[in-house]
Amino acid sequence: MVKTITISDDVYNELLRIKGNKSFSEVLRELLKERKGNKEVLKRIFGILSEEEYQEVKKRLKELEGEFEKWEQSLTQM
């Protein structure tokens, strides 16, 4: 059965960018599986870091995210 959904232009463009030769259904299915997998990983590692360690990791991840976004923007401007 086919269903129609409404998504914003920016979401459509992002899906279009990552889909390659896959169908939108395949891409969405992969993203949903990935999300579920991440949830399972989080359940397994919950509680292994102290609050201080968690805050440090969180800070570093935010820094890395910013660096990655800058790198990604530099690639799209080429």
Curated annotation (Swiss-Prot):
Source domain of life: Archaea
Entries under Pfam families matching the protein: VAPB_antitox
UniProt keywords, alphabetically: Toxin-antitoxin system
InterPro entries named among the record's database cross-references: Put_antitoxin
Family (UniProt): Belongs to the UPF0330 family.
Task performed by this protein: Possibly the antitoxin component of a type II toxin-antitoxin (TA) system.
Name of protein: Putative antitoxin PF1222
Organism: Pyrococcus furiosus (strain ATCC 43587 / DSM 3638 / JCM 8422 / Vc1)
Organism classification: Archaea, Methanobacteriati, Methanobacteriota, Thermococci, Thermococcales
